[in-house]
Amino acid sequence: IMKDQLLKALVLNEHVRLYIVRTTDLVQEAQDRFDLHPCACAALGRTLSVASMMGAMLKSEEEMLSITINGHGPIGSIVVDAYANGNVCGFVSNPHVEDVLIRPGKLNVGAVVGTDGTLTVTKDLSMEENFSGSVELQSGEIGDDFAYYFTLSEQTPTAVSCGVLIGTDGRVASAGAMILQMLP
């Protein structure tokens, strides 16, 4: 049985930082705990997956970050906290949001998240003031929005891919994410 894991690497002569995370168990736990409908599960699962990698980017165990995504869509807000040890926790305002499909079998996460709003990351780096960065949502599909956040708010060109596959039985078949970042 595959277990959730996070891998970090420097590639291309240490010019690119790579994070890959498998989060199937984590996302299934969230679905069970909050009785998430598929679109809500995909939205929260993608955010939890990216957040776990962002937590791993923190420098010390005392640091943590909070992510809030609110596109004024039917799902409401997605709120996730991430810690340096890889632990994450989060919730969505409306776990029973009605599913929207792009085509049969393909969830339209952007439609339930919405795009009329922001993605905000607040980092508690154990200093007097927290660092906070906020960007307008690009697609509501989560990955694009985080890529835009890293590029704009942290001035780090970044590619983000994340996904949650809900099986025909309604349970999480697979979940994970990847972050590629250009280093200065």
Ranges and model annotations:
Residues 2-184:
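Interaction interfaces in information-processing and related assembly proteins
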